[in-house]
């Protein structure tokens, strides 16, 4: 009887451990991964690289970008004006806040319009740990 109980408990523990993919990494590792994901997201938008951009999004965010047409939606960003695409590439991360499997990043960039260069207002970007990596949500 004890052997059966042990097998049942071990099986249940193994099943629970497999739920949801790998656990969220430690804080320092998460911060580095989050910053990389956000900067890459903006770079792929600027480049109009839909395939790479969609790979950085959660399922929910991919659906919001057009679901099956997510890549095509982001590919269109390549038609933005050069100053807007450059502003996306120049994004800087100001703060990262992590709470369990969710994170919030505050960013800004520098934009030039009419010969005047200014810091943009902050933008808040949500992320979620999904499929073993931090993804823009």
Residue ranges and their predicted role:
Residues 1-17:
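Sec-dependent bacterial lipoprotein signal peptides
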Residues 4, 18-47:
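Short, low-complexity N-terminal intrinsically disordered segments enriched in polar/charged residues
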Residues 36, 50-98:
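Short solvent-exposed beta->alpha transition segments
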Residues 82-90, 94-137:
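Exposed beta-sheet edge and beta->alpha loop/turn motif
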């Amino acid at each position: 009887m004890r052997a059966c109980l042990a097998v049942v408990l071990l099986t249940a523990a193994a099943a629970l451990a497999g739920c949801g993919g790998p656990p969220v990494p430690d804080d320092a590792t998460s911060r580095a991964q989050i910053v990389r994901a956000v900067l890459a997201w903006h770079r792929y938008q600027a480049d109009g690289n839909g395939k790479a951009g969609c790979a950085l999004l959660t399922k929910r965010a991919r659906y919001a970008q057009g679901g099956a047409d997510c890549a095509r939606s982001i590919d269109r960003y390549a038609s933005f004006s050069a100053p807007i695409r450059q502003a996306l590439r120049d994004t800087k991360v100001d703060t990262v806040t992590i709470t369990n499997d969710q994170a919030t990043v505050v960013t800004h960039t520098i934009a030039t319009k009419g010969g005047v260069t200014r810091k943009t207002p902050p933008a808040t970007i949500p992320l979620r740990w999904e499929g073993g990596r931090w993804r823009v949500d």
